[in-house]
Amino acid sequence: MPIGQPKGDEYSISIYKRVWDKTITHRYFEYPFPAWFYGFLAGIQEIFLGKNMIVGELQAEAWPPNGQSIPETSLVEQNKSLDASRLKDRFNYGKATGMKNIILWGGEYWYYREKILNDPSLWNVAKEEYK
């Protein structure tokens, strides 16, 4: 919640579902929060602050381990954090929050996978979702 001025017209929240834990477990970690949790946060802040909340960034891109960049990470490794099935689940998760505006982080990644890695799986999921 903003403390000073100016205050925004609406607030946003970032949702990263599957990330690399480089500090404790050194493995991929899936945040356990159900979609309704974010909808609940949005509802509470709307009640108290009267502002709409959007998903300003929903993870829809692979999260490479150990600070690697996407190009230096194998496709097999990238699929451990985001494959076509997980992307489909991510779209459904975003919708299940109940928020009307969801901005996805990863469109350029889907394009990269299709054009550079010759893997259209994510691009195809996105095409189906945006019909």
Where are the model-predicted features located?
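Substrate-binding cleft of secreted/luminal carbohydrate-active enzymes
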Residues: 51-131
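Glycoside hydrolase catalytic-domain groove-lining segments
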Residues: 1-68, 121-126
